[in-house]
Amino acid sequence: MEAVTLSEARVYVGTYNKYNSGSLFGKWLDLSDYSDKDEFMEACRELHKDDQDPEFMFQDYENIPEALISESWLSEKFFELRDAIEKLSETEQEAFFVWCDHHNSDISEEDADDLISSFEDEYQGEYKDEEDYAYEIVEECYDLPKFAKTYFDYSAFARDLFITDYWMDNGFVFRCA
């Protein structure tokens, strides 16, 4: 999945009426300017107040996962999720969406705080490879003498860790739930 930064989400808002009449008139709206979906929809209505009953068309968007938007729909959960992940670093936000993809989490339906909590329980960090993570586990959890560490098979240990207890994607390591 391409890196997504919800705080920088934007939507190009037009209407089906204008589009079907040959006009692509619309405007990019930054979702960071709105606290919730109602406020965003009010801005859409104001933008297209010349349409009697505008049917909004989200013709393009940036920094919004496809699970949260389509041409004619923006999830109610977008604003909740955007606000919930603000406490995560940029790297953690990227890892969060990798984790969501792996778990097939329906971010348009699930509670944002529950998703973040589950993610934080499983996320271990970013590593260059599985062996790099195994090396850290040995350093933190095992009191091996320096002599023994030179003979330790980190590759085999990493293989064993990632067979059952951990998984890695795009450099992000997660504990299996």
Q: What is the meaning of each model-derived region?
A:
Residues 2-4, 9-10, 64-66, 70-73, ...:
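Non-transmembrane, interaction-prone alpha-helical and coil segments associated with secretion
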Residues 9-14, 26-30, 55-59, 165-176:
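Ordered hydrophobic segments in well-structured contexts
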Residues 2-50:
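N-terminal ordered "arm"
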Residues 31-34, 127-128, 151:
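Conserved aromatic
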Residues 4-7, 131-177:
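Acidic, proline/glycine-rich low-complexity IDRs
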Residues 35-106:
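Structured domain cores in non-transmembrane regions
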Residues 39-43, 80, 95, 111-114, ...:
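Exposed alpha-helical structural elements
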Residues 95-141, 174-177:
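Extracytoplasmic/secretory-pathway segments with low complexity and glycosylation-like composition
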